[in-house]
Each structure stands twice: as C-alpha cells, then as structure tokens.
C-alpha cells in the first residue's frame, strides 16, 4: 500500500513538473511574447534550420555482426521440415 502511494506521488510530481515547464526558443520571452528587435533574425535562424533538415543524410552501418548459431539452426530446421513435407507428398 505504501509502495503504491509513493509511486503515485512520484508520478504526480513528474507530471506536474513536465506540465509546468515552458520552452523558450527563437527569441520567445515569458508569456509567449517575441522580442520584436530580433524578430527577423529569429526567422532567419528558423529558415536555416529547415534548410539543414531538408538535406538528406546518409548513414552507413560499420558494425559487422558475427554469424549467429541460432540462424544456422533455424536454417537447418527449415530444410528438415521442407524435406519431410516433400517425402510425405510422394
């Protein structure tokens, strides 16, 4: 009972903390008001970020995984099942 109560209080605290926080970016001030002196600069920054996101990014996997023994076992079982199915058809 005490464990459930503590977990509930912890969950409530985390939720309230997340809901009460405010994200400020691109010249926003408390209350959602923009700094009008730097408004053009804010939009230019946003435009640059959008252009950067539009460029495709290519990633290559450089990790070579060793051959899994489970994969070999699966292949052997599949071939046995196929062979038995062919023998039953004959």
UniProtKB/Swiss-Prot annotation:
Keywords: Amidation, Cleavage on pair of basic residues, Hormone, Pyrrolidone carboxylic acid, Secreted, Signal
GO cellular component: a single term: Golgi-associated vesicle
Modification Pyrrolidone carboxylic acid, positions: 22
Pfam families in the record: GnRH
In-chain residues carrying the UniProt-annotated modification Glycine amide: 31
Feature type site, description Appears to be essential for biological activity: 24
A GO biological-process term: response to prostaglandin E
InterPro entries per record: GnRH, Gonadoliberin, Gonadoliberin_I_precursor
Localization in the cell: Secreted
Residues of the site described as Cleavage: 24-29, 31-32
Superkingdom, taxonomy of origin: Eukaryota
UniProt function note: Stimulates the secretion of gonadotropins; it stimulates the secretion of both luteinizing and follicle-stimulating hormones.
Protein family according to the UniProt entry: Belongs to the GnRH family.
Protein name: Progonadoliberin-1
Organism lineage string: Eukaryota, Metazoa, Chordata, Craniata, Vertebrata
Gene this protein is translated from: Gnrh1
């Amino acid at each position: 009972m005490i464990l459930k109560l503590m977990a509930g209080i912890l969950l409530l605290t985390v939720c309230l903390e997340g809901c009460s926080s405010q994200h400020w970016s691109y010249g926003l001030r408390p209350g959602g008001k923009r700094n009008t002196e730097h408004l053009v600069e804010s939009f230019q920054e946003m435009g640059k970020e959008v252009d950067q996101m539009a460029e495709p990014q290519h990633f290559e996997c450089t990790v070579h995984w060793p051959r899994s023994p489970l994969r070999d076992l699966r292949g052997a079982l599949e071939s046995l099942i196929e062979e038995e199915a062919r023998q039953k058809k004959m």
